[in-house]
Amino acid sequence: SACVYEKLENGKLQGVATEGLFPPQRKMRTALSEETASRARFLEKILSSEILEEGEGIVGEVAKTGKPVFVPNAQNDPRVVKHPDPALAIRSMVYSPLIHDDVVLGVLVVANPSSGLTFSDMDLSLVNSLAEQAALAIKNSDAMNLRVEKTRMDSDLSLAREVQGL
């Protein structure tokens, strides 16, 4: 499972994209139960409403320092939140900053390899490479959105000039 945390304008971090049953980075107030209509949707809702401070937990630490963190044995790491639900048990995690032009845009977090084992140094390298690509994609998306907005404003101004000229 994985989650992308985006760094907001106020410097805080918010989960914006999840894959699988990604465990929240804080203790949950609401119990996750079998009755929950969609566990993945429920967790996605929790993660998107969970705002982390820069420096808070491992996600916040990575956002603050811009350095990746590798947790090969999460069950023995006191920094990792422990959830009572076995579906949210964390075995191993990789936290990688999304950096572009020396600016941290967010954090990519990957939990629990599908092998059931722990992540390796090679996995850490792969996640760091994915984070670099994701940061570039985010910046390209931002640039495209700015271009679209500029085109829209230019069109509105052109229309306003035509209306004024009538």
What are these regions (language model features)?
Residues 1, 7, 61, 65, ...:
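Amphipathic alpha-helical regulatory segments at dimerization interfaces
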Residues 3-50, 76:
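GAF sensory/regulatory domain recognition
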Residues 14, 43-45, 50, 55-60, ...:
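Signal-transducing coupling segments at domain and membrane junctions
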Residues 59, 95, 107:
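Short hydrophobic/aromatic beta-strand element in the GNAT-like acyltransferase core
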Residues 61-68, 101, 126-147:
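Signal-transmission/dimerization alpha-helices at domain junctions
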Residues 81-82, 100, 105, 111-130:
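Regulatory loop-to-helix N-cap segments in sensory/regulatory domains
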Residues 91-99:
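A short, aliphatic-rich beta-strand micro-motif
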Residues 135-166:
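Regulatory cytosolic signal-relay segments
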